[in-house]
Amino acid sequence: MNQEFYNAVKESVQMSQQRWVEWRHEMTGLLHCGSCLSLHKCWFVFEKAPVSPLHEKCHCTTVAIPASQVKSNAVAKSDYSKYNPYLFDPTNFYKHGKNKAFESWGYTISDSEWLQNEIEKQGKQQYLLGNYELGVLNMRGQRISIRVTIPRKNGTGEVSFVTGWMVNPGGEIKLNTPYGGK
């Protein structure tokens, strides 16, 4: 059995064993918390969902949803502009220096499309496996961190780094930053 097939079977089994929940904000009362509203209909692995209730007057609940629903509908999205010009920053407009890491691994701005596809693929895969960490939660939403691994283009081996995402309703995660650190 080849390694790729074995890994696919292993991931499928892992995914089917995950318990998923959908966050639901019940529209009762007059006032609503921005953080709670931003979580409405977002999906999380049960063990890695934000703690409910979030606050004393929280009306939110979590409802179990089938892993098959998550697997069928989950999607990872990223804007091309997160790679070109943001990540590689050819005009030094952003002044974040993230391009230096990728360039040291042999990547250039011409690799932006490949990086976008690969980071989306691995982001979705790791989200489905529950391999994410909760980050900041506020009225804009719940951020998660997902570790991805890419091959070095200028040598042997791989490099692993953290990517930053926002959890959106219905199983969508959207990339905030393609490089959040090692």
Regions found by a protein language model. Give the residues of each.
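Domain-core detector
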Residues: M1-H55, V63-Q126
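Functional cores of ribonucleases/endoribonucleases
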Residues: Q17-M27, H32-G34, Q116-K182
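C-terminal edge-of-domain segments
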Residues: P50-I65, S160-K174
